[in-house]
Amino acid sequence: MEKMIHDQLEESSAVNVLRHALFEAALLGTGVIKGPFTYEQSSHNWVKNSDTGENEYSPKTKLVPRIESVSCWDFYPDPDAVTLDDAEYVIQRHVYTRSQVRDLMNRPYFRKEAIRESLDMGPSYEARGYEASLQDRESTDEFDKNRYEILEFWGTMDTQLAMEAGLELEDDMDDMDEVQVNCWVCNGNIIRLVLNPFTPTRLPYLVCPYEINPYQFFGVGIPENMDDAQTIMNG
């Protein structure tokens, strides 16, 4: 079992994911990891046709676990929360190309018609003022033209509102005031709405501060830690 876990981590590039999270923890004060989730992975496979004797391409698919690194710039927790356990919800921002949005139609529980409608409405991404500096671009105009902004919500939702949005609930859940959901929105369209699949329900993120700030959600990184000492030395 231990060897299988190590192999799965290696195949899913978990080391690179952890490196990115640790880098942001040191630089910005907080690293964020999402998951684990299962994804369909395709592997090349050829099968000999018994009639023709020729090899035919027949890829195999299997479910594999995967974790993701989420940038602090794309992670919006409940503003009243100090830790993830206190958070009522979190929102993650995705910036996808047109083909990436279209690929969502092949993933489970995504609404194909809503995705098509969102694509027909055109790109919705607008760069924030700080992003040109972060990405070292003089202009983001060309980048903005072909990108779609998708907001992924994890948290509680009013039961009646969830049912109006097309979420099917079991009979024993109709009396609940709120339900835990995962909702994806693009161009104002709900492209995915499902119940939180985890038991017990939880927010599928791990937040790792470099140095804990007891009164804020995000931690303190190395540059902020060094700021006072560097100011004194420069003075």
What does each model-identified segment do?
Residues 1-235:
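Extended alpha-helical, oligomerization-prone segments that build pores/tubes and scaffolds
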